């Protein structure tokens, strides 16, 4: 007799996700949003700037050791370019004559850029080299993400079977569940393919030197991700969101659809036209496949292969969210501080498309109010997806709540792009 047990995922249509403004107010009152917001207000969750998580020593007040496995600043671009600071230093430098200050200022800006490019190239090489062993163990291209999703699902099922470990609906306390991979390793495995941009990037920098910044500002996709300046990053973020929020139906995954009851509609990847799949994949910041392959898939109408790539993004965001939430909610509010870097916060907002066309995410994260707005958007996004799930504070698995590979969750949801009026 075959002793194997088949695991069947049960789908329960969500009954609280509405299509009007009531949704936003309902999310703010949810236990998960309150728990996340409380940790931020109490200082348990901090947004940290200018910290080298790869350094051998860290500041005495650094929220280590958890942050070192949470952030990968070396694989992300700067959030602030010190242009005005450099010009101000030249202005106050008495050794530089007045007639030379203008040229000297811009010369030093150029040198700073070249130095940042050098650091970016070195970090790209380090990320690729340091993750070589993990890449063999967790091959993203060969189903590693699906295996990690199944691992999380087994955690959820085991929690359900062990009813004593289920949290109350008002606590939003995440039961401790170590995963076989930490977040830093996960995101660096996704970002390691930036190394293939180095030959063209290095050639352009070698030929044009300081002028290359203009090329990378107008053509940011040529530049390795961690070498982008805030100007190039803004142009890139605008290009990503432009197609997503377009009124034309062949952009992104299409408009967010609702059932007659006002709940978010379940939609599998195979229900989406090939053109929409292609446009979404080419606009995702950390693509796991080259654009020329995607173009071939589209031309040959290989919808299954395009759907596979969509599912990888769906799985990656689910795992990334799960690791972040576990880190934030598993800590003792009074004893442990969780540090999420400003670069990681901006990248989370970019990948989940929680911003408007024209938003300067780097400028926002360097402003107190702007940073809070970005965090609230992320909290609302997490609350919509994970409130009332077993991993946090509920009774349903994630698949039961939303269905398997519900790509409606990848669509742009304007209600989650909250403003400063969300407290």
UniProtKB/Swiss-Prot annotation:
Coiled coil: none annotated. It is a single-pass membrane protein. The chain crosses the membrane at residues 199-219. It comes from the Eukaryota. Keywords: Antibiotic resistance, Membrane, Mitochondrion, Mitochondrion inner membrane, Transit peptide, Transmembrane, Transmembrane helix. GO terms for cellular component: mitochondrial inner membrane; mitochondrion. GO terms for biological process: protein insertion into mitochondrial inner membrane from matrix; response to antibiotic. Probably involved in mitochondrial export. Confers resistance to the anti-pneumocystis carinii drug pentamidine. May act by the removal of pentamidine, or its damage targets, from the matrix by an active-transport mechanism. Interacts with COX18. This interaction may be essential for its insertion into mitochondrial inner membrane. This is Pentamidine resistance factor, mitochondrial. It comes from Saccharomyces cerevisiae (strain ATCC 204508 / S288c).
């Amino acid at each position: 007799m075959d002793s194997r047990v088949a695991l069947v995922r049960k789908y329960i249509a969500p009954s609280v996700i509405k299509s009007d403004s009531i949704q936003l107010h309902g999310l703010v009152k949810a236990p998960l949003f309150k728990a996340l917001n409380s940790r931020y207000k109490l200082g348990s969750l901090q947004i940290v700037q200018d910290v080298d998580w790869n350094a051998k020593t860290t500041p005495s007040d650094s929220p280590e050791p958890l942050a070192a496995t949470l952030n990968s600043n070396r694989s992300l671009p700067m959030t602030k370019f010190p242009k005005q600071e450099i010009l101000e230093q030249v202005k106050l430098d008495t050794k530089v004559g007045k007639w030379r200050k203008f040229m000297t200022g811009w010369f030093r800006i150029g040198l700073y850029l070249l130095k940042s490019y050098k650091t970016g190239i070195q970090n790209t090489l380090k990320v690729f080299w340091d993750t070589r062993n993990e890449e063999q163990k967790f091959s993203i291209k060969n189903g590693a993400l699906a295996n990690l999703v199944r691992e999380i699902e087994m955690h959820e099922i085991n929690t359900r079977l062990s009813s004593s470990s289920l949290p109350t609906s008002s606590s939003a306390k995440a039961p401790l569940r170590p995963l076989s991979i930490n977040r830093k390793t996960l995101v660096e495995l996704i970002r390691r393919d930036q190394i293939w941009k180095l030959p063209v990037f290095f050639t352009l920098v070698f030929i044009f030197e300081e002028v290359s910044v203009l090329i990378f500002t107008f053509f940011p996709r040529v530049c390795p991700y961690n070498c982008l300046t805030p100007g190039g990053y803004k142009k890139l973020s605008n290009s990503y969101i432009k197609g997503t929020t377009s009124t034309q139906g062949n952009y992104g995954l299409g408009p967010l659809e609702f059932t007659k009851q006002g709940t978010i509609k379940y939609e599998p990847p195979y229900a989406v036209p090939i053109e929409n799949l292609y446009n979404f994949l080419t606009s995702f910041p950390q693509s796991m496949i080259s654009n020329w392959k995607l173009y071939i898939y589209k031309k040959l109408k290989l919808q299954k292969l395009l759907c596979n790539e969509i599912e990888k993004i769906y799985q990656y965001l689910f795992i990334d969210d799960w690791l972040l939430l576990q880190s934030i909610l598993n800590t003792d509010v009074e004893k442990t501080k969780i540090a999420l870097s400003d670069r990681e916060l901006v990248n989370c907002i970019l990948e989940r498309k929680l911003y408007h066309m024209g938003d300067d995410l780097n400028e926002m994260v360097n402003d107190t109010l702007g940073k809070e707005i970005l965090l609230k958007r992320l909290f609302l996004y997490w609350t919509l997806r994970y409130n009332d799930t077993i991993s946090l504070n509920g009774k349903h698995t994630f698949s039961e709540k939303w269905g398997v590979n519900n790509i409606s969750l990848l669509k742009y949801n304007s209600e989650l792009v909250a403003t400063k009026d969300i407290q």
